[in-house]
Amino acid sequence: MKKFAFIFTIALGMLTTSCDSYLDINQDPNSPAEANMTTDIMFPAAEMNLASTYGDFYRITGGYFAQYYSHAFGTSNYVDYSQFKMSATRSSTDYTQLNQRSLKNLNTICQLAENDEEWGTFLAAKTLKAFIYQMMVDAYGEVPYSEAFDASNATPKYDQGADIYAGVLAELDEALSKASAGDKVATNFLLPGKNAGAWIQLANAVKLKMLTRESGVADVNSQIAALVSANNFPAGDVAWEGCWSNESGSLSPFYAEEFSTAWGSTQINVVANIAIVGTMQQKNAEGDVIFEDGRLAAFFEPNSSGVYTGGISGSNFSTSDNYK
């Protein structure tokens, strides 16, 4: 009996060890191990997480709230946005994507870059991090920041927007102080092949944008003046170009949402708003155009009569059929 118990104990021990070893192999073979993570691997992923949210949900809601967009005749997908409403249900997926993917990845990139003194990559990650926080604070007011990256804290506190702005600007200043124009930057899609000089310009632009938004409630005039005087900003558009194509899985986020027929839908919801059309095109009493902003034709298409006619916020009435 003792012999049997001894054998059983050995067998049980082997089984337990075997199970432990078996469970240890449950690592996604298509994902690199955490120990093998590099900034070159993580940076493009963080960018695409940002592009897919900012370029879709936040672009669309922001466009409606700013009265750039109105709703197409007879459709209802975004009528709530057109009425200046944004429910938690509608924004939950994108909000989670920014927090749990983009910001988390960018924070890890910052840590890796700082450990290796890769100050170009450090600045690039801090710049995108600042861009995201500026957008989220402007959209929600309060979001997790000071406790956001503590993995042991499942319920981080929501910081005040003013505190987040101050913290993010301080992070950006620190990164700018460490980076030099010739520093290398990890593989990325936004400014591919560029050294930190291009990212310094983008960081200055993001900083100016944040200070401008702060200027109504804080005295930041001297900081704005210093940035403007230095005049070290991007000379042209900074956009994700060359990474989209007219193929399933490679479409730009906004095009995929509104214009692609890949999902079997031909419905278009987003059209021009009368507010932006009236701002970019002025007519006299006879209806003749006396001024037209050159960007109008780049933003919108005229109706079948060659006229730009905007729709009214909060509606999807028949007038919306006259514009695009």
Regions found by a protein language model. Give the residues of each.
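Membrane-proximal, proline-rich intrinsically disordered regions
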Residues: 4, 19-70, 89, 97-100, ...
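Terminal processing/anchoring signals of secreted or surface-associated proteins
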Residues: 1, 19-21, 130, 168
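Sec-dependent signal peptide recognition
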Residues: 2-9
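Structured, solvent-exposed acidic/aromatic patches
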Residues: 36-40, 72-324
